[in-house]
């Protein structure tokens, strides 16, 4: 894979997604970001990162800021690639905005086909497969020029009454206030995208072997730092806003790249369930072998109600 040698150690430490196997350029060859971050606050950066601008040909354009690189903050943004949680959010946003869908998002699957480059617009072209009063199906393709970088599909649908509802995932999280002094993610090897998230770990972080010989689980309260209420875009961002759980099982972290991410949205968050945007997450390794690593994330509201879950497949390199 044509990736700069000096960048490999960064990925091995704290970043969660490598460029695709057919990436054409090393990170050092990627043009600089178009964002003028010097004069933007963190909320401004986050809002700009989620922004999709309609273009004359019907596409929606996003500009990728190096502030959302998965490379470490101690290196230039070009040492990493655009954060996959943000790209998932952009795919979801492009379908809703471009197709005028009003029903709640209930599932999203994103395939990461190739690495998008900084300094170029990323264009999304959504398409409705089938609309309906109760359920609607949509897809979107994202790319730069003739290069396809992402493909996503989504299911939207209205909620309805259920005679006997069951919530087996109900699990009250630890008190947010009790973890107000808990550690977060910081230091020179922290990925740039993590600067836009508040973290409060329960018995963590355990990266670089902290879970060796134990269940491979990380539990953490998280919120996006823009002060906005939690919505589907921010949930997409947070469901991927941690290092691979497998990296807590090994002192020497294995190289891997995400190939797809599926998110299921079980309930729309309310201010009571996500106070000030905070949600409790559990990231868990499900399988690691045969050249693959599969993990999941579950998001709970403050009352223990399950809000969303995600499953991610990564190719070991």
Over which residues does each language-model region extend?
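N-terminal, intrinsically disordered, basic low-complexity segments enriched in Arg/Pro/Ser/Thr
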Residues: 10-11, 19
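Terminal targeting signals and extreme-terminal segments of soluble enzymes
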Residues: 11-14, 34-317
């Amino acid at each position: 894979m044509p990736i700069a040698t000096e960048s490999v150690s960064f990925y091995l430490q704290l970043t969660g997604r490598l460029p695709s196997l057919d990436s054409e350029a090393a990170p050092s060859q990627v043009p600089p970001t178009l964002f003028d971050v010097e004069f933007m606050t963190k909320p401004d950066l986050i809002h700009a990162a989620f922004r999709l601008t309609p273009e004359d040909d019907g596409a929606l354009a996003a500009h990728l800021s190096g502030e959302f690189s998965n490379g470490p903050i101690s290196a230039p943004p070009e040492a990493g690639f655009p954060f996959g949680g943000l790209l998932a959010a952009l795919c979801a946003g492009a379908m809703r905005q471009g197709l005028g869908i009003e029903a709640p998002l209930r599932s999203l699957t994103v395939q990461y086909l190739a690495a998008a480059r900084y300094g170029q617009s990323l264009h999304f072209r959504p398409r409705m497969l089938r609309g309906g009063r109760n359920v609607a199906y949509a897809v979107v393709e994202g790319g730069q020029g003739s290069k396809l970088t992402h493909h996503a599909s989504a299911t939207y649908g209205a909620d309805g009454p259920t005679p006997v509802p069951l919530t087996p995932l109900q699990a009250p999280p630890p008190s947010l206030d009790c973890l107000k002094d808990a550690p977060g993610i910081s230091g020179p090897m922290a990925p740039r995208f993590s600067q836009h998230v508040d973290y409060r770990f329960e018995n963590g972080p355990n990266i670089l072997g902290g879970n060796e010989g134990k269940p491979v689980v990380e539990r953490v309260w998280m919120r996006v730092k823009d002060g906005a209420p939690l919505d589907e875009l921010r949930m997409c961002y947070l469901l991927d806003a941690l290092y691979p759980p497998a990296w807590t099982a090994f002192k020497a972290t294995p190289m891997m790249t995400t190939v797809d991410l599926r998110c299921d949205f079980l309930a729309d968050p309310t201010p009571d369930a996500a106070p000030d945007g905070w949600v409790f997450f559990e990231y868990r390794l499900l399988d690691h072998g045969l050249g693959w690593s599969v993990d999941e994330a579950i998001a709970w509201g403050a009352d223990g109600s399950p809000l969303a879950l995600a499953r991610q497949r990564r190719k070991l390199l």
